[in-house]
Regions:
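Conserved active-site and SAM-binding loop architecture
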Residues: 1-142
Length: 142
């Protein structure tokens, strides 16, 4: 049986890869731009590729993974933030993850990723349903 493989966008300190390893999932690559979190992740996952800025990645060029996780910036989605939602400068980076997922799916004829997991603040849910439906990213029973 082939092990599931994971890619992590907006990786931070590597919480998704850490959880993945504990479930028998192999973290393959991560994208993060902050040096301190990258150093932490490199210490725990020395073999995981660090790919840098999500805005410079192309999903067609990334090693295909079964699962893509992402915790895009929440500043514009948080109740204590400016509440510009996904139109805000930082929180709109969410769409970079969607772009990368779509590119990988196109390059693999829809095989990868099979699962996308987004982590964010509770207030984000008020902004996301219409976006997910418009982008045909979530097809689930009501």
């Amino acid at each position: 049986m082939t092990a599931l493989r994971l890619g992590s966008l907006f990786d931070g300190i590597g919480v998704f890869p850490l959880a993945a390893v504990r479930c028998g999932i192999e973290p393959v690559w991560a994208s993060e731009i902050e040096k301190a979190p990258i150093s932490i992740t490199k210490r725990h996952f020395p073999d995981m590729a660090h790919l840098g800025d999500v805005t410079k990645l192309d999903g067609r060029d990334l090693p295909p993974v079964h699962i893509i996780t992402f915790g895009s910036p929440c500043q514009n989605l948080s109740q204590i933030g400016n509440r510009k939602g996904l139109a805000g400068e930082k929180s709109s980076l969410f769409f970079q993850a969607i772009r990368i997922i779509r590119e990988m799916r196109e390059a693999t004829n829809g095989l990868f990723p099979a699962i996308a997991v987004w982590e964010n603040v509770p207030y984000a849910l008020q902004h996301i349903n219409d976006v997910m439906n418009r982008n045909q990213l979530c097809i689930a029973p009501p």
